[in-house]
């Protein structure tokens, strides 16, 4: 996935879960102590610089598990 595809994928999962990006940022702050502003979070998605640990937390907020599956 390139950075644009990652951004679109994450934003789509946020919307499908019934959240706004602002709400996700708020939950990251209140539940995980992540101090990101909405503009910083959006910029990370745009640059493709979202850290894996942040992606795991976002997945948890949205009700997803990230699963690593060995290719066959």
Task: List where the protein language model places each region.
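Short amphipathic recognition helices of helix-turn-helix/homeodomain-type DNA-binding modules
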Residues: 69-72
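Recognition helix of helix-turn-helix/homeodomain-like DNA-binding domains
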Residues: 30-50
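A short, Lys/Arg-rich alpha-helix, primarily the initiator
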Residues: 1-21, 27
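DNA major-groove recognition helix of helix-turn-helix/homeodomain DNA-binding modules
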Residues: 51-67
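Alpha-helical residues within the helix-turn-helix
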Residues: 26, 30, 60
